[in-house]
C-alpha cells in the first residue's frame, strides 16, 4: 500500500471558478471517487473564499493518503494524534487522510477539505506565521461551517465557568489536549465571527491587504477596525458575554439535569396529593360505615 501511495494517481482538473489555476490532487489508485469528490468540494467552495485571495497566482495542491505511514512520511512528526490533515508551506500542499483512515464520515471529510483550503489560500496571501493562530484557525472554522451548535455550547460553558483561553495563548493550540483544543477552535471562530458581524464582510480582506502592504497584524487590525489589539480583545469578550453566556443551558444534558429534578418534585407532590385523597376517601368510607351500623 505504501508503494501504491507513493506512485499514486495524479489528477489535474480545471477549477470551475474563473481566474483560478488547476486543482492538483494526488491520491491512491483505489480512491478515484474520493479524488473527484475532493475536487468538486474545492471548486464549489472557492467563490465563497474570494476575500482570502489577494493574488492572481495561487496553487491548489492536495495529497490524499490512506495509511498512517504515508501521512507521517508526508507531514513529518510533531502533530497531535487528533490531527488528520495539515497544510504545508512553503510546499503549498494540503495532506489529508482518507475518511476510512481518519474514521470520519464523508461529510466530516468535506469539512476538513474546506478547512485546509482556507489555510492554503490565506497562506498564499499572507504567510500564516505572520498572522495569529486564532485568526488562521478561526477563518478555517468559520468558512468550513465548523462553528456549529456544539462549538457554541463549548464556548458558552467556558464563559460560564470563567475558563476562556486568552487569544494570545492560542498560539500553542497544537500542544493542547483535545477538549482544550476544541475550546480554542471555538474561541477562534467566535473571534472571526465578531470581526465580520461588527465590522463587515470586507474586514478580513482589508486586514490581509494591510499586512501584505507591510503592516503587522496589530497595525492592520487597528487601521481596519479603529481598535487597538488589546481593546479589540476586550470588545470581543463583551460580545461573547452578550451572545453566548447562557447558550450552554440549551445543551440537552443540561436540559435533562434541569428538568429531571423538577419532574421528580412534581411526581412527589402528585403522589402525596393522591395519598391524601386516598386516606380521606378511606376515612369517609369508615365514617359512612360507622353511621350505617348505628342506623341498623
Identify the residue ranges that each predicted region occupies.
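Noncatalytic linker/hinge segments flanking ATPase motor cores
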Residues: 64-70, 98-108, 160, 182, ...
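C-terminal single-pass membrane-anchor helix
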Residues: 244-296
